[in-house]
Amino acid sequence: MQETTAQTIERVGLIPVLRARSAAQALAVVKAMIAGGVTVVEVTMTVPGALDVLRALKKQYGVKLLLGSGTVTTADQAAATIDAGAEFVVSPSFHPEVITKTRALGKLSIPGALTPTEVITAWNAGANYVKIFPCSAVGGASYLKSLLAPFPHLKLIPTGGVTLQTAEGFLRAGARALGVGSDLVNLDAIDAGNPDAIVDTSRAYLKMLEKFREGRVDTIKT
């Protein structure tokens, strides 16, 4: 049985947030991340030619790469990115029309929110997950844990300032997955001709996630 988009996101646990200064740079970053084991990528609409980047990635990698779109703020953008290959749509803020359009087209909706009121409003509007952004600017893992205390049913994805050093704390606080930007999407490494830096960081994130899950399973068993 084929995994759903939600199942893949939670199994993988990592959503690299792709920002780049050119389409070529974006494609080079994704190539390096895939070499490091990454299988999920969010292509933000701030990438020049973002729709073409989505189409190119879909054509090159097919089902091997779960594609999402990011920084989507209108229903038309959501529809366009889905047509280009996005299976999930991420916003930096709450736009009910984006949620409605995304869900109507059968895809996963991940709006952004920060305060408890914003988060529950987005969830009640039909969000599949809520992106907590910018999470690290307001307390990081402790803030995420505080949000989940009154709303344990919510599925939250912290984004903004997530690093290898802070990632495990977010997972322990209850994150369903991690949205990771510049700590993984290292544009300087690509410009310097050093894609291996991204390969290594990708592997480090996936290894950390694997170890975290093994530890959690061990705890449950005992």
Where in this protein do the model-derived segments appear?
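Conserved N-terminal beta1-alpha1 strand-loop-helix module at the mouth
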Residues: M1-A84, A104, H153, L164-Q165, ...
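Shared catalytic-loop signature of beta/alpha-barrel
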Residues: T121, S142-I157
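Glycine-rich beta-to-alpha transition loops that act as phosphate-gripper elements at the mouths
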Residues: R19-S22, V47, L67-A75, S91-H95, ...
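Conserved functional loop/turn residues at catalytic and ligand-binding sites
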Residues: G37, Y61, G85, S93, ...
